[in-house]
Amino acid sequence: MLSTDLHIHTSCSKDGESSVQQVLSAAIAAGLDAIAITDHDTMQGYKIARELDTSVLVIPGVEISTREGHVIALGIETAPNHGQPVLDTIKMVQDKG
């Protein structure tokens, strides 16, 4: 079984404070095997993390702002447009695989 945190924000997100490197260091210190960086409406934190040498599996993800609230999308490589109706956003995520 993997010890995983699937909802982490970095300073690439409007509400995150820790750099990507700080997040990865904290994940290692906490004994996590995997994390998903799910910054708001951007995948920049994930893109930075995938370039770093780390023992933590970094799952691609994003927290998408919709008209009705937020949706977490995992396993996609590009973020869909934000600010859309939630059902349209879910469809866009499904279409990305």
Where do the model's predicted regions map?
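Glycine-centered loop/turn motif at secondary-structure junctions
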Residues: 31, 96-97
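An N-terminally biased module of ancient metal coordination in phosphate/nucleic-acid-related enzymes
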Residues: 1-68, 87
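Glycine/small-residue-rich loop that forms an oxyanion/phosphate-binding "nest" at active or ligand-binding sites
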Residues: 59, 72-83
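Short, low-complexity, polar/charged sequence segments that are solvent-exposed and flexible
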Residues: 22-25, 77-80, 91-94
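Histidine/acidic residue-rich metal-binding segments in metalloenzymes
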Residues: 48, 83-96
